[in-house]
Amino acid sequence: MEAQIHILEQEAYSAVLRAFQAQADEFSWDKATVMTNLRKELRISDDENRQLLNNVHNDDLIKRIRDSRPRGGNQVVRHQSLDVHPSPTFSASRKKQKTFQSYPSIGSTRSKSFNNRVVSANEPAEALIGRKVWTKWPEDNSFYEAVVTQYNANEGRHALVYDINTVNETWEWVDLNEIPTKDIRWDGEEDGVTLNVGHGGGTTRGNRRTLSHGGRGRGPRTQPRREHLATENGGGRKFFGEIELFNTDSLVKEVERVFDSNLPDPHELDKAKKLLKEHEQALIAAIARLTDASDYESDGEEPYSHELPMLLG
C-alpha cells in the first residue's frame, strides 16, 4: 500500500511541475514555495526530485508550449536592480561542479531597490524561515541567492538552500551571526539595517561551512518518524471521500491537439491553459487528502522526510 501511495505522490508532484512549467519558463517565488512544501508532503527525495525535473524539462509537450510562448512574456523579473553577471565555476576544492545565480559585490544598498519588509532586531530565529537572502562567498566576491528553509535551535544554525527546486539544488547549515553584515543581504532589507536573529554570537566566518563530506550543500537526509493523526471519536479508521481528477491522458491529448496546430486559436489556447490550471488545483487538493490518508495507512512505518540534517564537522 505504501509503495502504491508513493507512486501516486510522484505522479502528482510531476503533474504540478509540468503545469507550472507550462505556465511560465521560470518559477515565481510563490510557486517555488509551493513546490518546496509539496516535496515535504509528498515525500519526494532529492534523487526523485532531480529525475522528475529532468523528465519535465525533456517533455515534448512542455517544449512545444515553451516554443509557442512569445519571447519576453510571462517571465519572472529577478531583481533588476541587481546587475547579474555570469555565474563563476567553482574550484574542485568545493567538491561540486555547478554554479549559482550570483550578484556582484553590492557594497552599499543605498542605490538598490528592496521592498520595505525588513529584519527586526528582535525577530526570532524561526521567523526567518521562508525568507530570501543573498550571502557573499569570499572565493569570488559575489553574492548568491538562497532561501532559508529550516532552523536548528540546538546548534543555532539555519539551512540555506540554493537553486531551490532545480536539478542543481544545494544547501548548507549556517550560523547567520557568523556572517559579517557586509556579506549578507535580505530581501526587504534597507541600507543600515543590522541582523540580529537572537542566537549565538561571533563575528568571524571561519566555521561557516560545516559540511565535512561532499562539499557545500551535500549530505544525507534524515528520516525522522512522523506522528500519526489522532483517530476521531476514540478509535477506528477515518474514511476519506472519493478523489476526482481529470483524466490525465485525455487532458494531455487535448492540450497537444491545440499546440500541434500551426496557428493555434487564441480561444483554444486560453481553454487549454484553463484546463491545465484546473487540473493543477485539483491535484493540489488531492495531494492534501492523500497526505492525510498516508498518515493513517503508514501504521508506524517511517516515511520520507526532507528536513536537512545537521552535519557536525
From Swiss-Prot:
Disruption phenotype: Reduced resistance to Hyaloperonospora arabidopsidis isolate Hiks1. Slight early flowering phenotype. Residues 1-88 form the ENT domain. It comes from the Eukaryota. Residues 206-219 have a biased composition (Basic residues). Its main location: nucleus. Pfam families: ENT. Keywords: Coiled coil, Nucleus, Phosphoprotein, Plant defense. The keyword Cell wall biogenesis/degradation does not apply. Gene3D superfamilies: 2.30.30.140, ENT domain (1.10.1240.40). It is found in: Nucleus. InterPro entries: Agenet_dom_plant, EMSY-LIKE_plant, ENT_dom, ENT_dom-like_sf. GO terms for cellular component: nucleus. One of its GO terms (biological process) is defense response to fungus. Residues 35-58, 267-293 form a coiled coil. PROSITE patterns: ENT. Induction: Slightly induced by heat stress. Residues 84-106, 195-229, 294-313 are annotated as: Disordered. The modification Phosphoserine is found at S294. Interacts with EDM2 in nucleus. Probably involved in the regulation of chromatin states. Contributes to RPP7-mediated and basal immunity, especially against Hyaloperonospora arabidopsidis isolate Hiks1. Regulates negatively EDM2-dependent floral transition. This is Protein EMSY-LIKE 2. It comes from Arabidopsis thaliana. The gene is EML2.
